[in-house]
Amino acid sequence: SPQIAGYKYADCLGHPSYFVPSEGVNTKTQDTPLALMACKSRYRMHSQLDGTTSHHFANIEDREPCWINPTDAKTRGIESGDVVLVRNKRGALLAGAYVTDRVMPGVVVVHHGAWFAPMDINGRRIDVHGNSNTLTMDVPTSSLACGNIASTALVEVEKWKGELPRVYVYDQPERVL
């Protein structure tokens, strides 16, 4: 639109435009060689319904699944059902590995909406339930819209070693009468 073009925003032109994401398949690094896609889950709406029985349909070891291609899983010694650490410079989470050819090599999927459950483990804060927002950027879609784009990031995935922390997000509060 001429009105939007008149704002002269470099990241929001007056016509439909594609902008290369700041993190994605084409910007991988040695430390973060996998592109994370934080897609919406079919079992909830954002984080709504995560505390209901619907989470049992997909979760692995009570954690959000991490879909990973067989080639990437084999390189990392990961099998379906393993608990994995998904990490980058912004954060880390634990997820249940789901090895599938439904994602292409170099890409992993951790669905959006798991309830946040941070714990300090060996001097590092790790979300033990699989909240993908711990890994994504907090930047707006454009100078005009300022919407949320928290759907991609660069990550590394490794098999979790050590004691598996308990997921506590579904615990009911103590009742005081």
What role is predicted for each listed range?
Residues S1-T53:
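Long, low-complexity segments enriched in small/aliphatic residues
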Residues S47, T53-W67, T71-L177:
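Long, contiguous, secondary-structure-rich segments that constitute the structural scaffold
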